[in-house]
Amino acid sequence: MFKILSRIGLAGVLALSSLSHAAETSPESLRIGYQKGSVSMVLAKSHQLLEKRFPTTTFSWVEFPAGPQMLEALNVGSIDLGSTGDIPPIFAQAAGADLVYVGVEPAKPKAEVILVAENSAIKRVADLKGHKVAFQKGSSSHNLLLRALQEAGLTFKDIQPVYLTPADARAAFQQKNVDAWAIWDPYYSAALLQGGVRVLKDGTTLKQTGSFYLAARPYAEKNGAFIQSVLDTFSQADALTQSQRPESIALLAKTMGLPEPVIATYLDH
């Protein structure tokens, strides 16, 4: 799944080479924002790869429920670097956030879906008309839903949007307070293995872009080369999902608080 990060190096070079003030030395600190589903980041954190590579830098890790909350923290200076889906940066920049794109991942069309109950009468996206759909506002799932509706000949006004964080959306979906749930992994894999759900639509035909790595502009301008090295370290962490798959699944299951079969399915997506 995360072969994607092997391509971040080039993206990082292209993005960071334009930052004329990039420094070769490691800075005093780096505050990293990550999500539960950030496999490469979670592995890098668990194995302390950054701490070992840059012993003079103090690293702090802050977990966020979704991209919008992470980028808000990045904008106000609470963190220096983060990774998020395709749409949150657009919302953040529209609100005036001074962020820099420093890396990109290819799209993962099977890792984000619209779910309905297994016995739901909703059989196709067009059937969502008039129904309640839960999702995190401003997230990549928001984008997935918009693109799916457009493909089906519907508009956003044709559904009843219910803006919820992943955890709250899962509860609402399980309690049948909403009719569908647009969500990403590992929440998707967890729901799938729990049973009682059906994938209405994934991103295969929707031409979505991948996730992005973003940094606060002041930090990136001073530490461009260092950020490139950090992304390279994340790529090394990602490689562990291939070279040490069983160990990585066990570690991710422990740190994410999810069963190993959920993690295995997540990586397959």
Residue ranges: model-predicted function:
Residues 24-155, 160-163, 179-183, 200, ...:
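Short, glycine-/small- and polar/acidic-enriched structural segments
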Residues 44, 135, 139-140, 167, ...:
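Soluble non-cytosolic domains of exported or imported proteins
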Residues 114-115, 212-215, 219-220:
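Short glycine- and hydrophobic/aromatic-rich loop-to-beta-strand nucleating segment
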Residues 154, 171-176, 180-181, 190-195, ...:
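A residue-level marker of the well-folded mature domains of exported/periplasmic proteins
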Residues 1-29:
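Short, low-complexity disordered leader/linker segments with a strong preference
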Residues 30, 130-135, 178, 216-220, ...:
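Second-shell loop/turn segments in exported
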Residues 222-269:
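Secondary-structure end/capping motifs
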